[in-house]
Regions:
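Metallo-beta-lactamase
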Residues: 106, 111-168, 176-180, 186, ...
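Conserved beta-strand hairpin/beta-sheet module of binuclear metal-dependent hydrolase folds
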Residues: 6, 17-66, 168-181, 186, ...
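Active-site neighborhood of phospho(di)ester-bond hydrolases with catalytic His/Asp-centered motifs
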Residues: 50-54, 73-80, 111, 199-205, ...
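Cap/insert and terminal regions of metallo-dependent hydrolase folds
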Residues: 186-192, 196, 206-295
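Short acidic-hydrophobic surface loop/beta-edge motif
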Residues: 6, 42, 147-151, 298
Length: 300
């Protein structure tokens, strides 16, 4: 297992109140056109990390809508090299290269296939002047299964989701603050009080039992739900190596997580998506369920 330590170049007041949140830039699957492909910003009071970037320059519009500037982005985790996750990364890198006054470095994290795809594309399509800036400003970190690394005040551990379609990494992130388990116990021991707040991102394919240790009992689980189980004959999730809101709810209950975030959905039921996906997941899961819209902020 390798280990990478990267410190966010931002001022941090140790006495400031911690604020952890996710901003969903997109919540849709690969072929959506009314909403954006699934990607999000994970941030604390002092650290910001972009996770995936969707399938095109729509990422620039989504970032602008939530008031995140290119100059704010110094960490980018890419789960896998499918079009709806990696092509927006090319635009982010291009904008970093041509951003006047960009300070510091952009750290891009991903597996070997992700690194190969990104580097191949930028080498083929960016101008020499832009490539020179990429060499100055962008650092590529090739990750292996189980690698641990720090992004500012977040401690991450990545894991291979064992996809049969495309090599893909999810991650477990320890965030500032303490786990909800601590608040639930009035007689918590000192060891338990130190238990961190943990989020797990499972990528965009079904859970594999090999990764239980990364996800079991986490405070927040981010999980794909391609459609409702009730609509499985229409959207064919299982044939596409995806799962449903019902499956996600069962998984969350089985793993003992506290909060469930569903994403990477179809877009034909947007008017009822939040209500119906929540209801279906709640048939088995007793914790809190979030079915966010694009640009929605979830406080962790």
């Amino acid at each position: 297992m390798g280990e990478i330590e990267i410190k966010q170049n931002m001022n941090h007041n140790e006495n400031s109140e911690k604020m952890n949140q996710i901003t969903m830039l997109g919540t849709g699957n690969a072929t959506v056109s009314q909403i954006y492909n699934t990607c999000f910003v994970l941030q604390t009071s002092s650290t910001l990390m972009l996770v995936d970037a969707g399938g095109g320059n729509g990422i620039l519009s989504q970032l602008k809508k939530v008031n995140v500037q290119i100059s704010d982005i110094h960490h980018l985790f890419v789960t896998h090299a499918h079009t709806d996750h990696v092509l927006g990364v090319i635009w982010v890198i291009r904008m970093v290269a041509q951003c006047k006054g960009y300070e510091g470095l952009l750290h891009v994290y991903g597996n070997d296939k992700v690194m190969k795809v990104i580097k191949t594309i930028i080498d083929m399509i960016l101008a020499k002047k832009q490539l020179a800036k990429v060499a100055e400003r962008v650092v590529f970190h090739q990750l292996e299964d189980g690698d641990c690394f720090e992004v500012g005040d977040m401690k991450l551990e990545c894991f291979d989701i064992q996809s049969t379609k495309e090599k893909q990494f999810g991650f477990r992130a320890e965030l500032p603050g303490t786990s909800e388990d601590n608040a639930a116990s009035d007689n918590a021991s000192e060891d338990n009080l130190a238990k961190p707040l943990v989020l797990a991102c499972l990528g965009d394919e079904p859970y594999n039992e090999q990764n239980r240790r990364y996800i079991d009992g986490v405070d927040w689980m981010m999980c794909e739900a391609f459609c409702l189980y009730a609509d499985r004959d229409t959207f064919k999730p299982y044939e596409k190596c995806h799962s449903t809101a019902l499956d996600a709810g069962k998984l969350a209950e089985e793993l003992g997580v506290k909060n469930l975030i569903l994403y990477h959905t179809e877009e034909k039921t947007l008017a009822t998506r939040k209500e119906n996906y929540t209801r279906e997941a709640a048939k088995n899961f007793k914790g809190r369920i979030f079915v966010p819209d694009d640009l929605e902020v979830i406080e962790l």
